[in-house]
């Protein structure tokens, strides 16, 4: 098997991005044909993931390969989550619904076409369910790259937002497409993702 093949039995699991990932983050790259700003995703890992975590702006979770000693050797993909709000217009102004936002999601181009994107989405849903046990979360939100709209629509039935709704916007994703998923749509769906405790049989 190629070293660039996804294999959950080969010490590949999710963990929060931390200092031990900084060295391998420089080898992360996104296929330029998959989005409009591929350099952004590497830059985010190298320059912003740690600071966002420390300041409470967002938490980045990486799917990483590890050696036999548990040291990360490659980042297959990552997803960054942050608290957000689904804003909607009313006669008196704006109101909001509690939400979790996928502010970053990227797959290393060395590991494309192996289901990594779906694993990242499933992990985001798992986190959403865990948060919902102690806090209100009604929607999962994302600003999708135009090239990724079909992926979000078909994989988990995300919908484009109408003119009635908004997500707090950022400069870099001004050309992206705001999409939403009502959380209870997936209440009966059980995400499957690799963890450090998974054994070969479970994988």
Regions found by a protein language model. Give the residues of each.
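Non-catalytic substrate-recognition and accessory regions of acyl/acetyltransferase enzymes
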Residues: 1-114, 119-141, 145, 149-203
């Amino acid at each position: 098997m190629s070293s660039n093949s996804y294999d959950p039995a080969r010490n590949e699991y999710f963990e929060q991005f931390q200092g031990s990932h900084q060295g391998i983050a420089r080898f992360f790259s996104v296929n330029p044909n998959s989005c409009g700003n591929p350099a952004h995703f590497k830059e985010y890992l190298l320059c912003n993931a740690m600071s966002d975590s420390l300041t409470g702006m967002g938490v980045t979770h990486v799917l990483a390969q590890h050696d036999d000693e548990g040291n990360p050797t490659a980042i297959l993909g990552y997803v960054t989550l942050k608290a957000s709000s689904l804003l909607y217009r009313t006669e008196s102004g704006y109101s909001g619904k509690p939400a979790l936002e996928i502010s970053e999601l990227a797959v290393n181009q060395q590991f494309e076409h192996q289901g990594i994107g779906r694993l990242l989405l499933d992990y985001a849903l798992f986190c959403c369910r865990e948060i919902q046990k102690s806090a209100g979360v009604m929607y999962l939100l994302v600003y999708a790259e135009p090239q990724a709209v079909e992926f979000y629509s078909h994989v988990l039935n995300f919908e484009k937002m109408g003119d009635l709704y908004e997500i707090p916007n950022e400069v870099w994703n001004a050309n992206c497409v705001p999409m939403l998923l009502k959380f209870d749509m997936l209440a009966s769906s059980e995400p499957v993702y690799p963890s450090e405790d998974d054994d070969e049989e479970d994988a």
